[in-house]
């Protein structure tokens, strides 16, 4: 299974709010420049009101939680899965299945800031994470051009059946806190849309259930 966390709320602080007191104070506290730190609503909320589509931005924690679910899964450990993160700003982060993402959130933030600065981590040797400019459509085409989407308006099927459907598929989950996909074609052109119920779930909750279903289908549980 290939998991794609799409339109994720992960980005560096944009230039238009570099001079905001909340951003300046956070950057100074961490000994970094304003443009070199991750946008985080929990720290930069007062500054984010001027940003376009601000409700969908500044949530690195969503990416962190989903990564923890996938990277520590049996799928990843057995080499049966891989995860990609597509950001709202059209960057793609590829994650090696062997990568052990920091469980501490602050350490994760520092790692991703380094990734944005250097393009890969670690800087030398075999990369565990790499980042590049790439749109979502290009990524999905690169991965075979066929995908399924987890979406509350999709078809609800038993978890046993879901596991069989997603085990060998590219699975797209939204990495944003509110709303729906900006790229409507993701839903319209998907091979299938599946739901875990009528209630919208956090990305990590969806990832957890999808991963567990795939693990069961693979005979790992």
Curated annotation (Swiss-Prot):
Pfam family, one: EMG1
UniProt cross-references to InterPro entries, sorted A to Z: Alpha/beta_knot_MTases, Rbsml_bgen_MeTrfase_EMG1/NEP1, Ribosome_NEP1_arc, tRNA_m1G_MTases_N
Record's subunit section: Homodimer.
Family label: Belongs to the class IV-like SAM-binding methyltransferase superfamily. RNA methyltransferase NEP1 family.
Molecular function as annotated in GO: rRNA (pseudouridine) methyltransferase activity; rRNA binding
Protein name according to UniProt: Ribosomal RNA small subunit methyltransferase Nep1
Binding site for S-adenosyl-L-methionine: 174, 179, 196-201
Site (Stabilizes Arg-59): 61
Native organism: Pyrobaculum arsenaticum (strain DSM 13514 / JCM 11321 / PZ6)
Keywords: Methyltransferase, Ribosome biogenesis, RNA-binding, rRNA processing, rRNA-binding, S-adenosyl-L-methionine, Transferase
Site (Interaction with substrate rRNA): 59, 100, 103, 107
Summary of the function given for this chain in its UniProt record: Methyltransferase involved in ribosomal biogenesis. Specifically catalyzes the N1-methylation of the pseudouridine corresponding to position 914 in M.jannaschii 16S rRNA.
Signal peptide positions on this chain: none
EC annotation from Swiss-Prot or TrEMBL: 2.1.1.-
Catalytic activity entry: a pseudouridine in rRNA + S-adenosyl-L-methionine = an N(1)-methylpseudouridine in rRNA + S-adenosyl-L-homocysteine + H(+)
Gene Ontology biological-process entries: rRNA base methylation
Domain of life where this protein originates: Archaea
Gene label: nep1
């Amino acid at each position: 299974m290939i998991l794609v966390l799409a339109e994720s709320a992960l980005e560096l602080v944009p230039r238009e709010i570099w001079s905001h007191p909340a951003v300046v104070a956070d950057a100074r506290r961490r000994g970094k420049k304003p443009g070199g730190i991750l946008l985080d609503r929990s720290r930069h909320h007062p500054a984010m009101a001027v940003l376009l589509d601000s409700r969908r931005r500044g949530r690195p924690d969503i990416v962190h939680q989903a990564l923890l679910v996938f990277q520590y899964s049996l799928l990843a450990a057995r080499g049966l899965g891989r995860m990609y993160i597509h950001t709202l700003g059209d960057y793609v982060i590829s994650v090696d299945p062997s990568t052990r993402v920091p469980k501490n959130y602050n350490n994760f933030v520092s790692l991703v800031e380094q990734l944005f600065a250097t393009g890969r981590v670690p800087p030398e040797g075999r990369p565990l994470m790499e980042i590049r400019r790439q749109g979502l459509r290009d990524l999905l085409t690169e991965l075979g051009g066929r995908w399924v989407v987890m979406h509350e308006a999709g078809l609800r099927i038993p978890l046993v059946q879901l596991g069989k459907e997603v085990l060998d598929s590219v699975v797209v989950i939204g990495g944003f806190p509110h709303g729906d996909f900006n790229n409507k074609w993701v839903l319209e052109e998907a091979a299938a849309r599946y739901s875990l119920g009528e209630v919208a779930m956090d990305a990590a909750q969806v990832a957890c259930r999808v991963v567990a279903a795939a693990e069961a289908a693979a005979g790992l549980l």
